[in-house]
Amino acid sequence: MDRTVVEACFQGQPDLERTVTGQRTRDANVSQGGSGAGKVIDLSLAGQGNFVAKRGFLIEMVWFLIEAALINNKFNPVSGLRIWLLRRFGARIGTGCRMQHPIRVKAPWNLEVGDNCWFGVNAWIYNQAMIRIGSNVCISQDVFLTTGSHDLAKTMDLRVAPIVIEDGVWITSRCVVQMGVTIGRSSVVTPLSVVHRSLEAEGVYGGNPVRFIKKRFPL
């Protein structure tokens, strides 16, 4: 193959090492397998990316034990105890909130919740970055809120971004809300949806990937 043609194939990909002889490509973390094999990212080289820990190892371990014993425990029905413990570890939670059992919170110091919010059974708040939840929000059963992902194309480094859920939102059962998303005021997300982008206010959304269905409040 002509060398000029080969190099043209790699225009716009400055991070890749270009090798004309043998017609192979790779970067620092991506290796090319044998004949007919695809690329594989070396997970041993993955880093922390833009994640910055806000608490030391000891605090994180203490929280891990408390979460396992008292927060994520179906035999502890006391919502007030969960909220009290979360506040002791840095969560900002308003009045009138209810947390069903069990529930998981990875980092209470990265959690802000307004007033009169409901959290259903098995809700999972995986907040490596900040999650801000407004007032009068309902997070239903088995909802997964995750502020983390990975650089899937090159290094698998950790990537984090905050989630904002505005006042009056209802996220129904078994939905996933991904990093960097803002869900607008009084919106509804229907069951089993994957929210990969920000949503405007007062809409009903559903699906995987999520799409607009209709306005929540008819004119």
Please place each PLM-identified region on the residue numbering.
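Terminal amphipathic alpha-helical/low-complexity segments used for targeting or macromolecular assembly
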Residues: 1-91, 168, 186, 208-219
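A short, terminal or domain-edge coil/loop segment
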Residues: 52-55, 150-160, 187, 202
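A generic secondary-structure micro-motif detector
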Residues: 71-72, 155, 173
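Residues at secondary-structure transition points
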Residues: 76, 80, 84, 88, ...
